[in-house]
Amino acid sequence: MLKITLIAACAENLCIGAGNAMPWHIPEDFAFFKAYTLGKPVIMGRKTWESLPVKPLPGRRNIVISRQADYCAAGAETAASLEAALALCAGAEEAVIMGGAQIYGQAMPLATDLRITEVDLSVEGDAFFPAIDRTHWKEAERTERRVSSKGTRYAFVHYLRY
C-alpha cells in the first residue's frame, strides 16, 4: 500500500502561505524538506509548482496537478487530479504531497502520515493547512522547539493516522 505523506510548514493559525509565497524563511525547514523528499515522488498543485524558485525539484519525481488539459510543467509530469497523480506513483513506497492548500484539503482523507513544521508565528495569509483532527491523528514524534538561524522558533512533528 502506498504511504501518503503530507509535508508542510504551518503557523500557529495553520497559515501556510500569503500571495503564493511562504510568509517566513526557515533554512532548517528547507533542509528537512529536501532530506525527507529526496528520491521520492512529490505531488503539488500548479500554483505551488509556479512558486518554486527552482523547477523541477532535483532528485525527486515532480508531479504537478492542474485542471488545465494543456498545462505544461517542464521537467515534471502533469496529472488532472490528485487520484491521477497518485496513480502515477504506483510502485513507489511513498508519495509526498507538498501543497498547496487545495491539494492538502483533497489529500488529507487519504494521508497516512503528516510531517509538519510548527512555526511559532501567527501570520496573515490566504492559504491554510487543513485542521488536524486529533481523533484521527496521533503524534508519533516531536523535536524540541528550536530557534532558526533567522530567529524563528519551530518544531518538527510527525503524525500518524490512527
From Swiss-Prot:
Pathway: Cofactor biosynthesis; tetrahydrofolate biosynthesis; 5,6,7,8-tetrahydrofolate from 7,8-dihydrofolate: step 1/1. The keyword Oxidoreductase applies. It catalyses: (6S)-5,6,7,8-tetrahydrofolate + NADP(+) = 7,8-dihydrofolate + NADPH + H(+). NADP(+) binds at residues 8-9, 16-21, 45-48, 65-68, 98-103. The keyword Oxidoreductase applies. Key enzyme in folate metabolism. Catalyzes an essential reaction for de novo glycine and purine synthesis, and for DNA precursor synthesis. This is Dihydrofolate reductase. It comes from Neisseria meningitidis serogroup B (strain ATCC BAA-335 / MC58).
